[in-house]
Swiss-Prot record:
Keywords: Cytoplasm, Endoplasmic reticulum, Heme, Iron, Lipid transport, Membrane, Metal-binding, Microsome, Transport
Sequence ranges of Basic and acidic residues compositional bias: 80-124, 402-450
Named cofactor requirement(s): heme b
Transmembrane segments: none
Gene name of the record: sfh5
Protein name in the entry: Phosphatidylinositol transfer protein sfh5
Organism: Aspergillus niger (strain ATCC MYA-4892 / CBS 513.88 / FGSC A1513)
Domain of life: Eukaryota
Amino acid sequence: MADQPEKTAAAPAAPEAQPPTTATTTTEPAVSESQTQPEPQPEAEQKVEQATTGEEASPAPAATEPPVTEPTPAPAQEAPEDKKEEAPKEETKETKAEESKEEQKAEEPAAEPKAEAAKEEEQKPAQPEYLAKNPALSQFFDRLSAILSSTGHNEMWGVTLKDSSDVPTVNILIKFLRANEGNVKLAEEQLTKALQWRKEMNPLALTEGRYSAERYGGLGYVTKYPEANGKETIVTWNVYGNVKSIDQTFGDVDGFIKWRVALMELAVKDLKLSEATTVIDYDGEDPYQMLQVHDYQNVSFLRLNPTIKAASKKTIEVFSMAYPELLREKFFVNVPAIMGWMFAAMKVFLSKNTTRKFHPISNGANLAREFPSLKDKFPKTYGGNGATLEEDAFTVNLEKAEPAPEAPKEEPKEESKQEQAEAPKEEAKAEQAEAPKEEVKEEAKEEAKTEQPAAEEPAKAEAAVTTQEAPAAAEAK
């Protein structure tokens, strides 16, 4: 027991005996850590510092307790270190956040166009069902703007071509696409040619023109027959059996085409494509089509005549290009056997979808059988009970050729009137003047007869000769 007080008395002298450098070593790192924020110290150094600080802070009587068991000094020194360790992390987070913001700002110009494009797509209306079901039709509309720009013309069959929201425009593009069996490239080529042709030909103006009655009178008609469902059946009639002169009608091919186009445009107008409110079912029935009848009664010249062949070939080329999918059916009535060459020519220029609509009928009186609902309206000539085409149909404007001016003949007529008025006076004067002469001549003749009775026989002989020569002269004339 006597030894213990000695040990306890010596303990307070230890701190004083400590060199001052130890105190500076403990305080200097704290200052440097707060300013420079060094890396965390090793665990061994931390324990040494904890021991020294514990000795300095604790009173002398508590020195007997193990320094490790004192919990209060250690947290006091560790708390700043934890904060010091967390501070760099927080700063790095802030710097990363700032860097990310700067990167976002740098990326914003590139992202803005994408965002705008996405907004535009969202704002666009949903694609119509007829385009969604038919990708080829959608592609065709994608090309329409370029087609109209290249041709410089936007009118087709009385319809101004617009976009895919316009029903009449949709129906026209469907017709061109169906005529080419869904091939967008071929449909585009045909539409381009048709627009260019209409720009040059101006078919709408041709319907207002006037055409020779001698050349085209009685050759073409258009009829409208109302049906029970409220619709109308449009029929064009071409009666080539009424041709008066082959050379006059077919010799001028351009003139013939213009007349034929004018008649076709009248029929197309009655289809009322511009008033359409329903899109045609691509795979279904097309209500905007007409019937055509070609009558070849008494026609026996089509196989050999080159003039008619040229006109027919040109007509087929123009109509197959400019008027696709406008025919429901086409009937060739009163067709002679020699017309086979014409059907062969048509198959060359027209698609199978078109040629299957052609129906030759040898007897025109059987035509009405093809349309039982229209029998009462069809002309009697074609097996119906209706009026004739001349009475019931309409056609292009026809005019008769004006007679040639007869100005040179009018002057002689006036002179002849004056001569006729003066003739009686002159004749009366002549008769009065010649009367004495004639009386003298008659008296002389009577005297001659009495004096020369034998001269009569030669005169009779001369009369007989002239009578025999008359037929020969007449035949010679």
